[in-house]
Amino acid sequence: MRVSRRSTSIAAAALVVVLLGALAALVGSSSSQASPKASNATFLAALVSDIGKFNDRSFNQSQLEGLKRAQRLLHVKIKPLQSNTTSDYIPNFSTAIRAKSNITIAAGFLLADTLETVADKFPKSKFAITDYCAKGATKCITGSVLKKNHKNVMGIDYAANQSGCLVGYLAAEMAKKQGGKQVIGAVGGLHIPPVDIWIAGYQFCAKLYNKNITVLIGYSGDFVAADKCKTVAENQLAQGAQVLFQVAGGCGLGTLTAAAQAGKWGIGVDKDQYKDAKRVLSLIHI
């Protein structure tokens, strides 16, 4: 039984909106503007993944699906560039620039330093980065701000604390239904702002539902290796966790596996991860 299941189209649709916003803000500022219909056929949008790769069934994959949806709906050209290691970051950005991409999107926090270097070197190229804010932004939810004020870079920030809040409230309710001591857990990847804000919202609203609930929080230090998240999750299960929430990309699939093997509920992130564990309680990505 699942309480709710959101399809992957939610994440994809969100990325389409992000892409549209990026196009309007970055490309629309160009002095020579063609009509949308005339320009779409030649418009090239590139996406550089982090080391989680496009098959992480989470963060990177959801962005790729959003890009592909933009291709279908907006009829733009796309260029996904997968990073297998951090040494691929610079070459992938270079490939996008050589291909004359109209906008190159960096998939998240781990690419920030590289993006800043590239943006400085290629001031005429347009970039965007998810889970980050441009320097001088009037509002930045995650608190992750680029070091320099790049006129050619757009930051894309999410209210992940609100999504985390909904998940925390739901987890607390499910724990209550199971009876006994109320314990839930959260397994993060790296201890970075985009992850911390998810977990902060999760903990806050779990406590809002039940002030006496115990919320266990752990980090794997990784976004890729599922066994590392599985180890953290198993430790939380041993402490009585009744529901586990993962915020760790592909690594977090290990959290869902551990929960399923223990007969407990797991909560996925970024994409519908029900098929990966069969005990996923809900997916919420807003």
Where are the predicted features?
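C-terminal region of N-terminal signal peptides and the immediate post-cleavage residues
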Residues: 22-41
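Extracytoplasmic "Venus flytrap"
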Residues: 40, 45-70, 79-89, 109-111, ...
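An alpha-beta-alpha
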Residues: 67, 164-213, 217
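Short beta-strand elements in bilobed, periplasmic/extracellular small-molecule ligand-binding domains
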Residues: 74-83, 210-223
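Short, well-structured alpha-helical segments in soluble
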Residues: 86-100, 226-240
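Periplasmic-binding protein-like
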Residues: 101-109, 126-130, 240-249, 267-269
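Flexible loop/hinge segments that line or gate small-molecule binding clefts
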Residues: 123-157, 270-278
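Conserved small/polar residues in nucleotide/adenosyl-binding loops
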Residues: 284-286
